[in-house]
């Protein structure tokens, strides 16, 4: 390698170092800044998405209150839950983007500036030292040749001249090798930086692929069920038809004005275990009064008529149905796919004897103003201890702990609530607790599951049974109403992660007061 080639390679080496320091690092800083803007924008999208699907949950609550659209309410709940899981995957991708890319690049670029500056100075100093040694040998050889030309005996300088030539050749070889190695080192440093960037970007891409794959998997699984649920908008569920027939059999005819009022103001919902009956609008009070006067129609917690089992959410259909009704639409698919963390819903046929017994035990009341949860959510007191174990969706508590119920009704004997002591949320067996009255005293809770057992039926026959106030017997089951701003507490809130179900890493946790306020709206 000639000296000119060595100098050219030296300039290339310096250019590589300067390119890294003057172009790569500033560009990397700009990339990090743009990445932070991107992260901030995605965080804003995530927050907006939570609000959007929170509103979707609210629409699902509204639909689930209706006898005609209850299945669609379950579908809306499933949609919100699926998209909540997708949003959780997006948040995981954002965490990876922040921790594995932006943070590490930001640390590297600060350390890299000082490291490259020191590496370039070291290379330049070593190259200059070797170049100076070569120049010195060449200068000595030049002087020696001048002496040899002016000497009468030039042969005596020949041996020394050969020594200088060998020294120059060795030093020039060392310089060329050093410059070559320096150029290789500079290219390696440049490549390492680009490889680091690509490696971190691949980690982000991997999480992005998992995010999209999770979304595709969930949506592909649920979408056909959702589409089937809304395939026939004109089909009225059997329970709504039976309700109309019950009204007709109780009064001789179906009142158009009553049905019209129920469409706009009246919401027909499933019974809430242990809760007071909902208030009835003034325009329906005379109508309900006439129904109360009929002694031949048994009442069970506000459900009038012989077909009261048809409105029980734990029973699919009564064995003897009018033949004119269309075949009952199975709801087991929607119930089973509602959440993979809920206990499996079973179909149990209630006994009419219990309904009659409870009707006799709990007399009706003329007061229709005893609304559900007038002073807030229902509270229960633990009468037994319960351990969740490894299941993060269950709630642990000890005897005597107070629990605030966060959903309106129990599902197969399981309720969802928040421990006032530990501030943890989760599902728990409702039979382990007693419902607290508004004054804070506890009373015996009688769930639908207990109402179906013979042991509880025998308990009702005892004289020393504490009977609730007369308002509990109000026959408002067929005519409950709620204002437009009143909804059931959502079982799957997108805005409150403590309600989440289905992700292993999203279990019960301590909830801040701000989360509680959001959940309460």
From Swiss-Prot:
Sequence positions bearing Phosphoserine: 262, 324, 326, 337, 347, 367, 385, 396, 455
Main location: cytoplasm
The SH3 domain, residue ranges: 375-438
Any one GO MF annotation of this record: cytoskeletal anchor activity
GO biological process: actin crosslink formation; actin filament bundle assembly; plasma membrane organization; positive regulation of actin filament polymerization; regulation of actin cytoskeleton organization; regulation of cell shape
SUPFAM superfamilies: BAR/IMD domain-like, SH3-domain
Location of Phosphothreonine modifications: 341, 361
Residue ranges, compositional bias (Polar residues): 349-368, 447-458
A Pfam cross-reference name: IMD
UniProt xrefs under Gene3D superfamilies: Arfaptin homology (AH) domain/BAR domain, SH3 Domains
Keyword vocabulary terms for this entry: Cell projection, Coiled coil, Cytoplasm, Cytoskeleton, Membrane, Phosphoprotein, SH3 domain
Description of post-translational modifications: Phosphorylated on tyrosine residues by INSR in response to insulin treatment.
Domain of life: Eukaryota
Topology relative to the membrane: Peripheral membrane protein
Coiled coil ranges: 132-153
Compositionally biased region (Low complexity): 321-335
GO cellular component, one term: nucleoplasm
Region (Disordered): 299-370, 445-480
Localization: Cytoplasm; Membrane; Cell projection, Filopodium; Cell projection, Ruffle
Domain IMD: residue ranges: 1-250
Subunit comment: Homodimer. Interacts with CDC42 and RAC1 that have been activated by GTP binding. Interacts with ATN1, ADGRB1, DIAPH1, EPS8, SHANK1, SHANK2, SHANK3, TIAM1, WASF1 and WASF2. Interacts with ENAH after recruitment of CDC42.
Protein function: Adapter protein that links membrane-bound small G-proteins to cytoplasmic effector proteins. Necessary for CDC42-mediated reorganization of the actin cytoskeleton and for RAC1-mediated membrane ruffling. Involved in the regulation of the actin cytoskeleton by WASF family members and the Arp2/3 complex. Plays a role in neurite growth. Acts syngeristically with ENAH to promote filipodia formation. Plays a role in the reorganization of the actin cytoskeleton in response to bacterial infection. Participates in actin bundling when associated with EPS8, promoting filopodial protrusions.
Free-text domain note: The IMD domain forms a coiled coil. The isolated domain can induce actin bundling and filopodia formation. In the absence of G-proteins intramolecular interaction between the IMD and the SH3 domain gives rise to an auto-inhibited state of the protein. Interaction of the IMD with RAC1 or CDC42 leads to activation. The SH3 domain interacts with ATN1, ADGRB1, WASF1, WASF2, SHANK1, DIAPH1 and ENAH.
Name of the protein this chain belongs to: BAR/IMD domain-containing adapter protein 2
